[in-house]
Structures are given as C-alpha cells and as structure tokens.
C-alpha cells in the first residue's frame, strides 16, 4: 500500500505543538486509536489536523474541505493508496471534470463524498498517456479511425488537416480533459459511492499479512492470538509447509511501535505468545503503560519486547504527566502543596527544574505519560536480572 501524505494531528483544546503527532497516511485503525491516545483525546471533534506534505495526489490539496473528519480523510487516502499510475491519472482527470461541472452549475466546493466517489470510479475512464494537447488528440482520433467522416480523404490531404481544431471539437463534445500525465475521458456513467460501513471493533491484538516466497498470488491474513489449528490453516492457504516458506508483507499491532519490529516469520510462535500477553495487558489496564515503556526504553528486537513485558512491574508510569509543565506542577504540589506551590510556580525556571527532576528520577516523558525505572536506574539500560524480585514500586514525588 502506497503512502499518500504526512499529516499532523493535534488536540484542538491545546496550543502545545509538542503534544501533536505526525502520521503517514493512510493509517490502520489501531494507529489512529494510538494517535488519539497520544494527544489525550477521544472525540474526533476535538482533533485538529493538517496535511504537511503530499507524496502523491498533490492536486487534492485545494479541495480538502475544512469540515472533513480525520476518519473520512483516512478512508480517502486508503482508496487512493491502492491506485496504480493509470488510475492516478484518471483520478486527476475526473477531479478536473468535477471542478468544471461545479463551476458551470455554481455548486460550491467539492465535497468529501465526491472525492471518494471519484476515487471509486477511476476504472470508468480512458487514459491516453501520450496525448497532451488538442493537436495530439486530433491526430489520435484521425489516425485510429475514430473520425469516419474523414476516412474517404486521400492520404495527401491528411497533412492539411487542422488537428488542433479537430481535437478541440472532440474534447469538448465528450467533456474530456488534459492532465500533466495524459488525456482523460469518461467511458461510463459514474457510480454512486457505496453505503458507508462503520468500523467494527477490533478483536485481534496483531494482524499479520503473509505471502508465499515463490508465489505472490498465495496470500493470507492471520489474526493473533490464534490457535494452532488456525495457524496450520494459514500455512495451507499459503502453500507453505514451513513458516520460512512465507514472509510478512504487513503488520498491524495494537502497539504500533511493534509494526516495525515484527519482521521475521520464523518468530511467529513467539509473536503469537506476545499477542496473548498483549490481550492480558489490555484486560488489566496495563497496555498504555507498556506502550510508554516500549517507547522510552529503546526496544529494537523481539527479545527486548519480551524483556519489557517480563519486567513491566519494575517500571513506574504516570499517565497524567505528559509534559514538563505537568511535571513541575505535580512535583511542587508533592513537596510544598497549596499556595506555596502556586507562588513558587509563578517565579520558577520551569524548564531547568523539570530537566533536573527528570534527571533525578532517571525518567523520560512520552506521549502516553512519564516513565522511569523503579530503582531509578538508567532507562536505556536493561534492568538486571537480580533486581526483578523488587515487586513494589517506590513512590516518587508525584
């Protein structure tokens, strides 16, 4: 699936740019849910978003309606990401035709639903990649026998034809349009957008898309955790007697950080075990803490992930402390409390104080909250095995 654009996502209830998230669209449902968690909001109406950069389909920029929700835009980019080069040209042509229609009928801006409808109709067009002008179009129609009224002309007369005029007449009669990548004309009526299907609640912890090494047509989707029977069924679908006969082509985990770590198909039994652990963390309300610990401790391998799972009780996590200002307020309230805390807060070098507090606790701020080791050791170093028995988390000044 192609990446379409970079999107900045933030909470409209705060002006703190550091609390925003950069995402490459389209994103999975889990990635979207994770982004909402990072910006500390659940309601789509509380979200501010903007496209920072288009990798393709740049011509859509002037037509992004301010009322478009982030979910609608993600659905649109998901449609666009599946288009090939010819279909992308068709999309640009269809959009230009729709803009022309709106201008003629004074219908106002293009709507989100129209953009999605156009993207679903790209196969209802003909694209002439080598035709870029009225003259090119005229020659194409004459030389390919589409102007039967000119077939009787002797060969010597063709050089005298005004191909630009012929092309202009044909383009206007069939309502075609030129794009930077060729001429586009509709061959069928556009079909309306299918009824919207609301997103269903996700039951899997990790979804893997797999493909046979030697046969790209053999693909399968495996939702984890899975039974041994289901895993054997997927092997049959892939025609892969052993897991090393297949490869991952996609990963969607409830902890998006894992998407880039789960790459080796021979780790599949351990990944299934990981999915079971994630399910247990979700049920116990510890999933956000695990996300924060994974992000703060530089997990780079599957072994690192299992280490953090095993030693999760040895980390402290404060979900309400997501920035330095919250850290300073919390620390002052713990140390002084009341009016004294408010007074000192007004006159304090908060940036320097926050840095010192983080250093003292060996802590790090993550989009999910603050993390530190229970023994106040360096976060970027593994917790030694002999310290695992310390099950009680010491209380910090928060």
Positions of the model-derived regions?
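Short, extreme N-terminal segment that most often corresponds to the first beta-strand
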Residues: 1-31, 200-228, 393-398
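Residue-level signal for functionally critical sites in structured catalytic/ligand-binding pockets
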Residues: 10-12, 72, 139, 164, ...
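Helix N-cap / beta->alpha transition motif
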Residues: 24, 162, 349, 372-373
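Mixed-charge (acidic/basic) macromolecular-recognition segments
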Residues: 36-157, 183-205, 216-217, 223-342, ...
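Conserved, folded interaction/cargo-binding domains in eukaryotic regulatory proteins
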Residues: 148-176, 335-363
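Non-Sec secretion/translocation targeting segments of pathogen effectors
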Residues: 162, 349, 383-398
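Long, highly charged low-complexity segments enriched in Glu/Asp and Lys/Arg with interspersed Ser/Thr
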Residues: 168-199, 355-388
């Amino acid at each position: 699936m192609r990446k379409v654009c970079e999107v900045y996502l933030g909470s409209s209830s705060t002006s703190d740019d550091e609390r925003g998230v950069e995402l490459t669209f389209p994103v999975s449902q889990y990635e979207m849910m994770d982004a909402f968690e990072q910006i500390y909001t659940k309601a789509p109406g509380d979200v501010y978003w903007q496209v920072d950069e288009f990798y393709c389909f740049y011509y859509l920029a002037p037509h992004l309606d301010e009322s478009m929700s982030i979910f609608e835009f993600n659905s649109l980019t998901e449609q666009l990401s599946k288009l090939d080069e010819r279909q992308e040209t068709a999309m640009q042509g269809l959009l230009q035709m729709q803009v022309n229609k709106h201008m003629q009928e004074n219908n106002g801006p293009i709507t989100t639903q129209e953009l999605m409808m156009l993207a679903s109709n790209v196969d209802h067009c003909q694209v002439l990649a080598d035709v870029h002008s009225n003259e090119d179009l005229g020659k194409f129609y004459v030389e390919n026998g589409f102007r039967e009224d000119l077939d009787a002309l002797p060969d010597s007369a063709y050089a005298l034809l005004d191909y630009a005029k012929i092309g202009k007449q044909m383009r206007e009669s069939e309502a075609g349009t030129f794009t930077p990548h060729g001429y586009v004309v509709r061959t069928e009526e556009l079909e309306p957008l299918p009824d919207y299907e609301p997103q269903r609640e996700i039951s899997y912890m990790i979804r893997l898309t797999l493909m046979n090494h030697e046969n790209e047509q053999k693909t399968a989707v495996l939702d984890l955790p899975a039974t041994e029977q289901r895993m054997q069924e997927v092997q049959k679908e892939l025609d892969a007697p052993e897991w090393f006969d297949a490869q991952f082509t996609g990963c969607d985990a409830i902890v998006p950080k894992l998407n880039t770590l789960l790459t080796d198909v021979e780790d599949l039994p351990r990944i299934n075990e990981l999915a079971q652990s994630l399910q247990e963390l979700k049920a116990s309300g510890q999933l956000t803490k695990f996300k924060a610990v994974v992000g703060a401790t530089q997990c780079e391998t599957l072994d690192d992930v299992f280490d953090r799972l095993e030693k999760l009780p040895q980390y402290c996590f404060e979900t309400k402390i997501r920035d330095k200002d919250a850290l300073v307020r919390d620390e002052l309230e713990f140390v002084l409390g009341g009016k004294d805390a408010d007074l000192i807060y007004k006159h304090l070098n908060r940036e320097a104080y926050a840095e010192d507090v983080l250093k003292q606790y060996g802590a790090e701020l993550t989009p999910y909250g603050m993390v530190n080791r229970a023994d106040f050791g360096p976060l970027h170093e593994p917790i030694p095995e002999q310290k695992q028995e310390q099950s009680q988390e010491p209380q910090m000044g928060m």
